[in-house]
């Protein structure tokens, strides 16, 4: 039976803090809907101390910013984008349009049609999330989206040059230096200077994530995103240093980022706790990671790998790193996760930044019903049908009876007209 050696905050405690975020975001959205560009500008000034003549960067400004970025940084961005583009292109190639003749004269099909416009949010705040440019903008472009715009906030009153460079290289059609709820709402509802989009994607802080949730419906979204999560599944072949390093490597994202260990080894669990305490003494981001670990960290001791799968599927975490003798066991048996990282040779940082899979992944148990962002999220699977006259009459006779069975007389009339015109 699973034994909790360490537990984080309860769901009820987390919900209490979320209620305040929900109310704040709702009021900001309502204000922007009412006041438009004026509210966007005032909120940008209030939250980011940012009030430029135009939020949108001109082609000349982008060119100047790109030139200011060191060549090595640009080369690394290009390398990462090559990996992400290649995998996204392979995923796109796996999605096929079809047309089949299901019975004589009845032709059914579907087409995968890209969304016309997408707004991508590239977070800033504590860290410039350069990689989010690749994951959202580039992936949308590979999917065939015609208009892809990107918003990213200023950082300490400055334009994040590396982020803008990545957005530009990824293929953004419009780049705005604008952050927070004001950016999400402006993209969703439109303003005097920003044309509304059909879909919002990308991660962000609690306020950005809540804005996306509240705006869902008038626009599509990729998924509901919460604080990043990491789960490590390990047996006695793993070592405490690697487990602790990989847990803290994600805990540094923010003070509410859950980091969990499921292990069959009590010895490893104890080593990991000690190693985390040791690493927190020197980790530059310990001020954040320590809070995340103390308030949201978790260690679960299980009897065997089968029980580890059960517990891992209950958590349904965003990132699941497997440090066991046979990592593929979890590839074969787990069903609820955002992304799997199999073996000590890979890790979550690779997926977050460069290896090629998308880092926008489900959190807060959403992995129970959805995967992460990929080219398929930007495609609408739309069906169509057509019939020969003979098939129309045949289908119509059955449709007449089924419509009458349900009491839909107007529906029956549609079928009856075809039977009359095309039947023999």
UniProtKB/Swiss-Prot annotation:
Zn(2+) binds at residues 250, 253, 352, 411. GO terms for molecular function: histidinol dehydrogenase activity; metal ion binding; NAD binding. Gene3D superfamilies: 1.20.5.1300, Nitrogenase molybdenum iron protein domain. It comes from Shouchella clausii (strain KSM-K16). It comes from the Bacteria. Its cofactor is Zn(2+). Coiled coil: none annotated. GO terms for cellular component: cytosol. PANTHER family: HISTIDINOL DEHYDROGENASE, HISTIDINOL DEHYDROGENASE HDH. The active site is at 318 (proton acceptor), 319 (proton acceptor). Its EC number is 1.1.-.-. Binds 1 zinc ion per subunit. SUPFAM superfamilies: ALDH-like. Keywords: Metal-binding, Oxidoreductase, Zinc. This is Histidinol dehydrogenase homolog. One of its GO terms (biological process) is L-histidine biosynthetic process.
